[in-house]
Structures are given as C-alpha cells and as structure tokens.
C-alpha cells in the first residue's frame, strides 16, 4: 500500500532500543500538551521524546519516510502504542506518536502539542517503530 507516493512493505521488524523507553517517551510528550514551542518541529519533538539530544540525520519527515521506506521499515494498519505515525496533512508529511486506539500525540498542524484521533488528521498514513538510526 502507500502513503502518498511511498510503497509500503509489510514485514516484521523488532522493536528498537531507544535511550528513553516507550512509556517514558509518551509521558514526556503528554507533559508538553498545550505547548506551542514545538510548532513545525514534529520530527525533532519525537526524536527528543525518545531520548535523542542530537539531530536525527533526516532533514524532515518526508526524508525520514523515504529512508524508512527504502529500508522496508514502514507498516500499514492500526499503529501500536509508541509507534511513530507518518501522515499526510496538507501538502506535507508529518509525524506523531501513537497512544493506541487510533489516537496520536505530538505538535499537530494547528500548533500546540495535542492528542488527536488520527482519522481526524489524515486517512493517508503509515507507521514505524520509533527508529532514529542516526540519533545519539
């Protein structure tokens, strides 16, 4: 299937060990609900949520999706809790983190960090494990 122009391969990929575990990363994000400091920085927000202080090595979410697709790390269907959800909003690819049950958290297009139903943001999405291969 596809997220815009990206072809998605279904394959089992093991969870990645990040500096901050999934629940801690989600708590970090939920503690920032309402903050407008992350406007237009959804990729940086997710990278920092999972404990990476330095740049991810990707220019933006579109660059990340391209890299993840090339490495066959994208999946379709309902994203599990803690997965990164890559979605089309307007003319850009954005990223948020799955809370499970179709909800995501992150700096959304409207500005502040929020919790939203993914279906209200986009019907064109894929997900990946929280993988930042170039982060430190």
PLM features per residue range, with description:
Residues 82-87, 95-98, 104-106:
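Structural recognition of the beta-strand scaffold that forms the well-ordered cores
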Residues 9-15, 26-34, 98-136:
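Aromatic- and glycine-rich peptidoglycan recognition patches
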Residues 58-67, 92, 97-98, 111, ...:
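Generic detector of ordered, mature protein regions
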């Amino acid at each position: 299937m596809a997220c815009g122009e990206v072809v998605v391969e279904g394959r089992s990929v093991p969870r990645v060990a990040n500096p901050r575990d999934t629940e801690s990363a989600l708590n970090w994000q939920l503690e920032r609900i309402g903050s407008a400091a992350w406007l237009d920085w959804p990729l940086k927000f997710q990278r920092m949520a999972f404990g990476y202080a330095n740049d991810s090595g990707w220019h933006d979410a579109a660059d990340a999706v391209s890299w993840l697709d090339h490495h066959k790390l994208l999946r379709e269907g309902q994203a599990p809790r803690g997965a990164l959800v890559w979605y089309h909003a307007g003319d850009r690819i954005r990223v948020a983190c799955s809370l499970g049950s179709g909800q995501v958290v992150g700096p959304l297009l409207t500005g502040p960090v929020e919790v939203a139903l993914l279906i209200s943001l986009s019907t064109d999405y894929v997900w990946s494990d929280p993988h930042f291969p170039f982060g430190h």
